[in-house]
């Protein structure tokens, strides 16, 4: 096998610097070094570079020249240095150097694009994204897309939160309505609906009454024990039980004093403070309630049924948190109402000075038998003038008396009860001593109707002070044992201003209902608060309705008689006429 000998060429030495010597310098020398320098490829350029530049290929031995005529004239058809020629041909798109036919003017129009990513900030959110997604896009464009996606994600998250909150509120609203959907009285098939009045009409009413006249004061009052004003959650007091004392919840028409006053023709309208307070605060109510109305001659009696909802005290009526619907649950609306009534009775007797001293009045308790132990209560029969030919007499209750500034002052005693802090969100044992305002604000939100009715009753009775106790369970699951945590006192007029209870609006509601009922014929009627809508309805019922031998057969809601448009318009027209009469009287008084 014959092989060609491999000839080693001499490596030229450059005495002037690094790298091969310039070929132009070796023209006359005949040394091997000069000969090797003369054989160097003349068209291999030198390009300066930095470490941040991308490196391309040194030579491309597989490239076919697409435009051979553009090759510079080197005097040889097959120039071995063509593969190294960077100036005449674009070797690769990755180099960033190209020539358009070797024209220097066109080459000057090209600009290198900075491919370096922008410097990352040392602080700020570290958003994660796929580095291999859209690799061909520039880094600036990629950052803009990341910001746009971030904004879209924020909008989507806000939209989901908004929908979640709306659905959550709707669920609570539906559950709240479902818990209070049952009517306080079963609507019978033979009942005839006469009027339907929305609460929005009540809010526009206003009527000013003159100072009432005291007709009679019955019963006896014990003095308030001021030591209970010093009670705090740290020195709580156990709530006692007063089983031997009798409490009376007598309706209007069964009151012997009211019967006597009606016989003496002292007034045309008769009611109790609890019934009037229910009417005055009707727009704040959520649960269903009912009032029996009897028209006898030219007189009107507002009564309550035996075992009526008015005998109980609502708990968490105006709260957004739903209560258990099961009647057997200790935290259901009915169970809490019974518990609240029991707490109020015991609280009103425990905070008294039990030394036998009692303030007596004109007559004894009209409902007590001789020798019977009765609770401390006084009944104040007062008369208001509603019109020139119309007066209203109401029986108002007071629970205690005290000497304030050497003057006799009448008090009303009521108690708020805490059953489970998780429902209200405020633990009384932790907040009562340091944040009483927050506790009271929470109670106004959850029990606004009950507090408004207590205030209305205190105003009707002309009480000098309202005492409100804060009573809590010993344990959230123990509804028999309770403790008194604190007692606060308020003036009724000042407290009415705090809870936005307008006296003129209260009497405007009563006046409109009385005017509407005085237009009815003699008979028995019932006014029912709708269980699911903010409105009241007036039904005509048989004379034997709500008697002991009267059997009630509930009628489904969809089969109940609905009011005609004429009746609805008639009720609104009556209310509007009452409002016009009030405005005319006000103008005459100013004139």
UniProtKB/Swiss-Prot annotation:
Pfam family, one: eIF-3_zeta
Name this polypeptide is given: Eukaryotic translation initiation factor 3 subunit D
InterPro entries: eIF3d
Species the sequence originates in: Arabidopsis thaliana (Mouse-ear cress)
Gene Ontology BP term (one): cap-dependent translational initiation
GO CC, alphabetical: cytosol; eukaryotic 43S preinitiation complex; eukaryotic 48S preinitiation complex; eukaryotic translation initiation factor 3 complex
Subunit structure comment from the entry: Component of the eukaryotic translation initiation factor 3 (eIF-3) complex, which is composed of at least 13 different subunits.
Comment text on domains: The RNA gate region regulates mRNA cap recognition to prevent promiscuous mRNA-binding before assembly of eif3d into the full eukaryotic translation initiation factor 3 (eIF-3) complex.
